[in-house]
């Protein structure tokens, strides 16, 4: 059974795992070392998470184990649109992918952000990433193409 809930403060360190898992690796490409998440352009997603009022995170718990997370914060990241729009990141451990858990996480986060009054949410995704379709189904629209990536926004 899958339970979607807010992350607990003592669990925030798990976002490092999900940040690494969120890195899209095309078929046949060697995964980068885990130390890649220490790079400044990636640390913006997790450093000090929970300290700002616009930091929100939901986790998916399957049989008592955290299987995935979706989180947003207003940050100057790849998905940055403006200083009022939170950027979204989502990731699951590989063994939980393809079961609809990511869709549940995404939809519940969007519902929560609507209730909190956010007018829109943004994200950046590589064009080859299988999650692109999930974002489109959730209402995200491409607002800018950036080489291999697209900047997407969903208006609430």
How would you describe each model-predicted region?
Residues 2-17:
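A short beta-loop-alpha structural element at the N-terminal edge
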Residues 7, 90-92, 125:
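Hydrophobic adenine-recognition pocket in adenosine-nucleotide-binding enzymes
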Residues 10, 14, 66, 129-130:
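Short alpha-helical
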Residues 23-25, 34-84, 89-93, 146:
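Acetyl-CoA-dependent GNAT
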Residues 89, 98-111, 115, 136-137:
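Conserved acetyl-CoA-binding loop-helix of GNAT-fold acetyltransferases
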Residues 102, 106, 128-131, 148-153:
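Short glycine/proline-centered loop/turn elements that form peptide/ligand docking sites
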Residues 113-126:
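Conserved GNAT acetyl-CoA-binding A-motif
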Residues 136-146:
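Conserved acetyl-CoA-binding loop of GNAT-fold acetyltransferases
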């Amino acid at each position: 059974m899958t339970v979607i809930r807010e992350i607990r403060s003592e669990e925030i360190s798990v976002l490092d795992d999900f940040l690494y898992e969120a890195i899209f690796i095309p078929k046949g490409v060697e995964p980068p070392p885990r130390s890649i998440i220490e790079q400044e352009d990636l640390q913006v997603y997790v450093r000090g998470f929970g300290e700002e009022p616009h930091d929100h995170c939901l986790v998916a718990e399957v049989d008592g184990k955290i299987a995935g997370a979706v989180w947003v914060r207003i940050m100057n990241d790849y998905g940055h649109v403006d200083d009022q729009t939170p950027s979204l990141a989502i990731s699951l451990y590989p063994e939980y992918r393809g079961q609809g858990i990511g869709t549940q996480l995404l939809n519940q986060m969007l519902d929560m952000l609507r209730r909190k009054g956010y007018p829109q949410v943004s994200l950046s995704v590589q064009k080859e990433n299988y999650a692109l379709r999930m974002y489109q189904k959730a209402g995200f629209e491409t607002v800018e193409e950036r080489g291999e990536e697209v900047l997407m926004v969903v208006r609430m």
